[in-house]
Amino acid sequence: MLGAISLAETDNNVIDRGETTRIMTATRREFIQTSVALAAMPAYLHPAGSAQRTPTNTAPNILWYEDEAKRWLEALPIGNGRIGGMVYGGKSVERIALSESTVWSGAPSTSDVNPGGREHLAEMRQLLFDEKYEEARHLCEKYLLSHSKSFGTNLPMFDLRLEIENSDEPSNYRRSLNLDDAIATVSYESNGRTFTRESFSSNPDHILVVHLSANATGQMNCKVAFSDIKLPGVIAVSASSGNHDPDTITFRGNAFETMHSNGKQGVDVECSVRIMSSNGRRTAAGEHIEIRNADSVTLLIAIATNFAGQKPADDCAKALQSAAAKTYAQLRRAHTEDHHALFRRVQIDLGTNSHSSKMPTDQRRRAVEAGASDPELSALFFQYGRYLTIAGSRENSPLPLALQGIWNDGLASSMGWTDDFHLDINTQQNYWLAEVGNLSESQTPLFTLIDILHQSGQRTAIELYGTPGWVSHTITNPWGYTAPGGGLGWGIFVTAGVWIALQMWEHYRFSGDREFLRHRLYPVFKGAAEFFLAYMVEHPEHRCLVTGPSDSPENAFRSPSGAYCSESLMPTCDRVLVYALFSHLIEAQRLLSIDPELNSKLEAALKRLPPLQVGSHGQLQEWLEDFVEAEPNHRHTSHLIALYPENQISLEQTPQLAKAARVTLDRRINQPNWEDTEWSRANLVNYYARLRDPESAHKHLVGLISKATDDNLLTYSRGGVAGAAQNIFAVDGNTAGAAGIAEMLLQSHEEAINLLPALPAAWPDGSISGLCARGGFQIDIEWQARRLVLATIISKRGGQCKLRYEDKAILVNVPVGRRVRIPLQSFRNSEKSPAKV
């Protein structure tokens, strides 16, 4: 038994406070009581959900380059949760590609549902019962698919273009993105002078800011204009109130396009640039403003739409007036303080490669592609995922992260995908990092969209399926589109709404917020459950409840006759998601002591769901029947939702299913021409972390960084896959890949919080602080030689947590406002956990 240690840490010293806590060691029959040190949290520290730390060394959190960007996927992203910019860092011509999350074509619609679905639903199901899959497919195409004329897409806007006059060829050039400060910087020398350019997108001031300066007076000469205009509209140059010289360039137009809408529907868009120069003179020529002999120049860019009924011109004017009343130093300080409050909650150190750490980021990535080890680049990739989450999704964001976040290269929006919200994995992946990465607030705009789906999905449920409750399918837009999509194989994913709604359950599990559970989560879950209780029918042969017609997105199978088919009854992903919905709702009812009648129905239905099944190859079946896969190299593995992010397959509780999941992975990724995309690679990191296979998880993390990530470390969907003619940026690989790193270091989906469950040999020494675990805990971990040294726990709610390391477990009481330190010897003095590893 460990002796009681009475120590409390303060910022500068250690003093005796005489406080202890209780730890109980997990044995096969009981927890044996023991004591360990309880360190009192200094009073000035924030609770776990908002703790900030000033990093001792922020250099690892910088992307930097020795040349300007030539392509969009070389530019550096900045964002404030709504306004995005891709900064090219040009020496003579700076380009910042502007975007805004609500710049959407399309419009709300109440006529998306196919009018024949409800009438022919029973006929489609009977054909599926009779294994007449080709005939059922024909009816699904005719009576279930929707062909919306007003769905829309997020659209790119245009570039802010700065033509910069340099007296000679710039030297000592460097451009960088500091993740800690969220500032993109360009610096170089010309004619003996040093020039600096800083760009950031400010959430407190609702604007994007560009500041140009030199180390001597009167050196700034440049022209400012909009270029590469992608929206219909007009540009005007004017002088703001009280100014004689022109200082404002304004674009006024519309988000119109004809691929995903009718070319006449879309939001009104306004973008205004206010130019503030220290000394010098401004003149207008056509649609640009020229600045001569200024000491410094500050550009304030405001963007607004009428997405939620606002007046874009008024909103832009208000933002510019407020920002223009502040100095650049004040704007910068407000921005960095706001960003630090989120970003500095988590720090990570995975070790270093002294040679690689001195290289520019693009060279480091290519070195990894060539086989070099660079653990610091993996740490940078993790923090980059958090940075992009902060930059793209804030508590006050009007919309959640779309396929491309809040940035837009014009590629996804100009092909069949659209730059929308895909609910068959991509939007979910965008937020897998949020809770564990200590950015819980970033999910707020997602929950708002889920509330919209909950409302609009009620119309789809009754009109398409004749049921109560609500339903949503594979794709959605800002106005809550919930009808099926326009294509077989992907459009009829009937549990898509459930999958995205499960993010609300994760938020509850991490936060323990009973008010959120009662008032936000419960109505959404109850409505979804009411739909599936009415929608599911008994399979005449298997005697279980089934969904259908439904897809296992976006995959297909061979019918008994060899035909290519995709619509079936109760694909495994549907079973996993309905099981999760019902079981979590039952738990919510227990916690809230409500709805006993519905609870009884859910309990009964839960017992009638089909089991997860192992197929003829030893694989986890993707469908209720053991179909032959039509595309065995397919990128989607939707049935493995059961392994991650859900917890229906585990090494301890379902070892045979865990083995089948591994067989599924081996068969899929070893197929010739496996569809290797950014998000499917990120999946592999998380899957193998759950299987506690650290080397495979690390292998696929390296593969993600080296094979599906460009020089700016943004991930992309590879050209030639899923209809993409070229590599197309998607933010899901960044966020889900970063979530995979967290999953390798900390897992809390089971009974215990598991420390270092999948630590690879490539990270022998390191630390991470500020990760969040389910139950309201925040965890710091230090390790050396691949062995735990110290874990530190903070609880924002107070309570008991079970900690597991390797094959041993201990039970820890963590009072609110206390920092409990758990050294390795706490586990060494325990007996083995009964859990099988």
Language-model features: where?
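N-terminal export signals
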Residues: 30-50
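Short, well-structured active-site flanking segments
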Residues: 394-406, 443-444, 511-518, 534-548
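Aromatic-residue-lined binding/catalytic grooves and analogous aromatic/hydrophobic interfacial grooves
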Residues: 53-489, 506-508, 526-529, 591-594, ...
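Extended, hydrophobic alpha-helical segments in both membrane/secreted and soluble proteins
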Residues: 496-507, 520-533, 680, 697, ...
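C-terminal capping/lid segments that line or modulate ligand- or cofactor-binding pockets
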Residues: 73-98, 102-103, 123, 143-145, ...
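N-terminal secretory signal peptides
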Residues: 1-26, 39, 52
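Hydrophobic (often cysteine-bearing) scaffold residues that line and stabilize catalytic clefts
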Residues: 377-381, 426, 443, 496, ...
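Beta-strand segments within the central parallel beta-sheet cores of soluble alpha/beta enzyme folds
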Residues: 223-225, 445-448, 463-464, 516-526, ...
